[in-house]
Amino acid sequence: MPQLDTSTWFTTVLASSITLFILMQLKISFHDLHKKPSNKYLKLFKPTNPWEQKWTKIYSPLSLPQP
């Protein structure tokens, strides 16, 4: 039975590990992270109804004076 030649295993494992590391780094570097939400669209919004511009107080029936 012939002896198994293991002299190239170190080179094969090392090259595979380096290749896998490079591929994973490339995959991670192309991944886009979400940006934080900004308020630029809220500043452009203007209310169109007159009741949205002023504050109104709503009374609860239980808070009204009882006769």
Swiss-Prot record:
<dbReference type="GO" id="GO:0015078">
    <property type="term" value="F:proton transmembrane transporter activity"/>
</dbReference>
<dbReference type="GO" id="GO:0015986">
    <property type="term" value="P:proton motive force-driven ATP synthesis"/>
</dbReference>
<keyword id="KW-0066">ATP synthesis</keyword>
<keyword id="KW-0812">Transmembrane</keyword>
<dbReference type="Pfam" id="PF00895">
    <property type="entry name" value="ATP-synt_8"/>
</dbReference>
<keyword id="KW-1133">Transmembrane helix</keyword>
<comment type="subunit">
    <text>Component of the ATP synthase complex composed at least of ATP5F1A/subunit alpha, ATP5F1B/subunit beta, ATP5MC1/subunit c (homooctomer), MT-ATP6/subunit a, MT-ATP8/subunit 8, ATP5ME/subunit e, ATP5MF/subunit f, ATP5MG/subunit g, ATP5MK/subunit k, ATP5MJ/subunit j, ATP5F1C/subunit gamma, ATP5F1D/subunit delta, ATP5F1E/subunit epsilon, ATP5PF/subunit F6, ATP5PB/subunit b, ATP5PD/subunit d, ATP5PO/subunit OSCP.</text>
</comment>
<dbReference type="InterPro" id="IPR039017">
    <property type="entry name" value="ATP8_mammal"/>
</dbReference>
<dbReference type="GO" id="GO:0045259">
    <property type="term" value="C:proton-transporting ATP synthase complex"/>
</dbReference>
<keyword id="KW-0406">Ion transport</keyword>
<feature type="transmembrane region" description="Helical">
    <location>
        <begin position="8"/>
        <end position="24"/>
    </location>
</feature>
<feature type="modified residue" description="N6-acetyllysine; alternate">
    <location>
        <position position="54"/>
    </location>
</feature>
<keyword id="KW-0472">Membrane</keyword>
<dbReference type="GO" id="GO:0031966">
    <property type="term" value="C:mitochondrial membrane"/>
</dbReference>
<feature type="modified residue" description="N6-succinyllysine; alternate">
    <location>
        <position position="54"/>
    </location>
</feature>
<keyword id="KW-0007">Acetylation</keyword>
<comment type="function">
    <text>Subunit 8, of the mitochondrial membrane ATP synthase complex (F(1)F(0) ATP synthase or Complex V) that produces ATP from ADP in the presence of a proton gradient across the membrane which is generated by electron transport complexes of the respiratory chain. ATP synthase complex consist of a soluble F(1) head domain - the catalytic core - and a membrane F(1) domain - the membrane proton channel. These two domains are linked by a central stalk rotating inside the F(1) region and a stationary peripheral stalk.</text>
</comment>
<keyword id="KW-0138">CF(0)</keyword>
<keyword id="KW-0375">Hydrogen ion transport</keyword>
<keyword id="KW-0813">Transport</keyword>
<feature type="modified residue" description="N6-acetyllysine">
    <location>
        <position position="57"/>
    </location>
</feature>
<keyword id="KW-0496">Mitochondrion</keyword>
<protein>
    <recommendedName>
        <fullName>ATP synthase F(0) complex subunit 8</fullName>
    </recommendedName>
</protein>
<dbReference type="InterPro" id="IPR001421">
    <property type="entry name" value="ATP8_metazoa"/>
</dbReference>
<comment type="similarity">
    <text>Belongs to the ATPase protein 8 family.</text>
</comment>
